[in-house]
């Protein structure tokens, strides 16, 4: 019998190199799809074999319960170690692909729709950004990088348009409006959301931006004329009306996490920063302490707004107090989202 792994368990498997290589090495249209969607959950012997298989793929025990999807709820009961989901009849077999004989997985573009019932819009935005990013968190909790994302925004949007009548699509569209592509870490995603959300939602309203855009710069450590490619975390979009007045080629913002605390990395970061500045790129940097310092972040945003030609925001004392509360609430909300258990800590928020 075929088994379809879905929801949280599918997300867990998508971060493995085994599944990533299947996606990366499979040409468009050549995925193997289930011949039939199963209409019953796995029996006890099948469940034991499934647990063993997932353990081998993950390299550790799978999170319980294991989420599986079927087509019918006739006589279906929840059983220990499994979470049974009933598939919407409008979802085609092509939303799943084979990872082993008779074992199928939800495709990345369908994951946000599956998770839409249990996730808030903001949580879905982080999930979509993760699927469209070049990072993943391994089983030991370590941040790792990949050459390319599991899915592009274009592909996800195409799936949503094609299946617009499936419940959850509208919610995912709302989340997609808050999400980003090409993020290299979870903190880049959070910084992006804080920077781009409107001020009424606790963000800084800094407009559109790109992540990890490549810039060719002169290597300052080279004795010969050599160049290097640098990719700042966030690149701000300068309004057309301000571009002629802009002395800088670009305004960028970077997050320096724990990896950047060693002496060797700080030296490399200093050289990299100077290379960007020498190439005409104004490069702001924040670390964990600055990220959580609301006064420092607000003052930094004032500078960035001026650099990219956005008007200064003038607030009364009472408005400033209310705005600061919204900023704090947003940061708390972002921190409350558990990337290992999507939908486990749903908060009510209005970021539509």
Regions found by a protein language model. Name each.
Residues 147-352:
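Surface segments flanking catalytic/ligand-binding clefts of nucleic-acid enzymes
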Residues 1-167, 325-352:
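Short gly/ser-rich loop at a beta-strand->alpha-helix junction or flexible surface loop bordering the NTP-binding
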């Amino acid at each position: 019998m075929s088994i379809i792994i879905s929801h949280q368990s599918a997300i867990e498997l998508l971060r493995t190199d085994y599944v990533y290589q299947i996606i990366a090495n499979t040409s468009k249209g050549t995925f193997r799809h289930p011949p039939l969607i199963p209409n019953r959950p796995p029996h006890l012997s099948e469940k034991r074999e499934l647990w063993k298989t997932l353990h081998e793929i993950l390299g550790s025990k799978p999170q319980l319960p294991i989420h599986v999807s079927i087509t019918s709820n006739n006589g279906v009961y929840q059983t220990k170690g499994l979470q049974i989901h009933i598939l919407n009849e409008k979802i085609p077999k092509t939303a799943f692909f084979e990872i082993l004989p008779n074992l199928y997985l939800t495709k990345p573009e369908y994951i946000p729709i599956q998770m839409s019932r249990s996730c808030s819009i903001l949580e879905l935005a982080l999930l979509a950004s993760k699927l469209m990013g070049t990072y993943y968190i391994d089983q030991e909790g370590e941040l790792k990088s990949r050459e390319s994302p599991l899915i592009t925004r274009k592909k996800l949007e195409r799936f949503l348009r094609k299946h617009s009548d499936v419940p959850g699509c509208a919610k995912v569209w709302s989340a997609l409006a808050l999400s980003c592509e090409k993020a290299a870490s979870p903190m880049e995603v959070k910084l992006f959301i804080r920077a781009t959300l409107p001020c009424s939602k606790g963000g800084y309203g800094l407009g559109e931006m790109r992540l990890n855009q490549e810039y060719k710069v002169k290597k300052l450590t080279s004795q010969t004329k050599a160049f290097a490619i640098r990719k700042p975390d966030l690149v701000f979009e300068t309004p057309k009306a301000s571009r002629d007045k802009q002395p800088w080629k670009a305004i960028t913002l970077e997050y320096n996490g724990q990896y950047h605390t060693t002496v060797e990395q700080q030296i490399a970061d200093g050289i990299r920063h100077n290379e960007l500045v020498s190439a005409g790129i104004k490069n702001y940097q924040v670390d964990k302490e600055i990220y959580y310092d609301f006064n420092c972040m607000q003052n930094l945003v004032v500078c960035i707004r001026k650099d990219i030609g956005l008007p200064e925001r003038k607030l009364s004392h009472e408005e400033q107090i209310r705005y600061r509360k919204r900023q704090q609430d947003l940061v708390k909300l972002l921190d409350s989202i558990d990337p290992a258990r999507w939908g486990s800590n749903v908060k009510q928020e209005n970021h539509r």
